[in-house]
From Swiss-Prot:
Cofactor comment text: Binds 1 zinc ion per subunit.
Subunit annotation: Homodimer.
UniProt-recorded Gene Ontology molecular function terms: histidinol dehydrogenase activity; metal ion binding; NAD binding
The encoding gene: hisD
GO-annotated biological processes: L-histidine biosynthetic process
Name the UniProt record assigns to this protein: Histidinol dehydrogenase
Organism (species): Salmonella enteritidis
Keywords: Amino-acid biosynthesis, Histidine biosynthesis, Metal-binding, NAD, Oxidoreductase, Zinc
Cofactor: Zn(2+)
Family as reported in the entry's similarity comment: Belongs to the histidinol dehydrogenase family.
Length: 167
């Protein structure tokens, strides 16, 4: 889609098996164990182990976004995708939802940064309670639990009158 002949991937260590599998499916030629603004700098300027690239795309926290912005403004800078703001997600869950899956969806955004916003809308108070319990269980295993907790402090689980009110 981006028109690149060579595709590289940077991800902080340890790189999850799921990421490695997705990279293989997408034809990624090189993978580097580096993340954050450091990865952006390595990709933008090249390093002993990471090649300089023409385009830098992908998610990241506020530091990554700022690094990408700075790189893109240089005359010799790499092209970037749209600068990202805080992560956000709104999940609508009915009585058939799996609380563990809903909790994972919420936490996948909450862990991006303390300014992330996650919201659950559901007409089922039991689902809301079970999702809240699942979030707490999963937080215990989450490497970025402190960041996710900060985001969750400003997030909401809202029980509505019915599913139509969620929409």
């Amino acid at each position: 889609i981006a028109g690149c002949q060579n595709v590289v991937l940077c991800s902080p260590p340890p790189i999850a098996d799921e990421i490695l599998y997705a990279a293989q499916l997408c034809g990624v030629q090189e993978i580097f164990n580096v993340g954050g603004a450091q990865a952006i700098a390595a990709l933008a300027f090249g390093s002993e182990s990471v090649p300089k690239v023409d385009k830098i795309f992908g998610p990241g926290n506020a530091f990554v976004t700022e690094a990408k912005r700075q790189v893109s403004q240089r005359l010799d800078g790499a092209a970037i995708d749209m600068p990202a703001g805080p992560s956000e997600v709104l999940v609508i869950a009915d009585s058939g939802a799996t609380p563990d899956f809903v909790a994972s969806d919420l936490l996948s955004q909450a862990e991006h940064g303390p300014d992330s916003q996650v919201i659950l809308l559901t007409p089922d108070a039991d689902i809301a309670r079970k999702v809240a319990e699942a979030v707490e269980r999963q937080l215990a295993e989450l490497p970025r639990a402190d960041t996710a907790r900060q985001a969750l402090s400003a997030s909401r689980l809202i029980v509505t009158k019915d599913l139509a009110q969620c929409v």
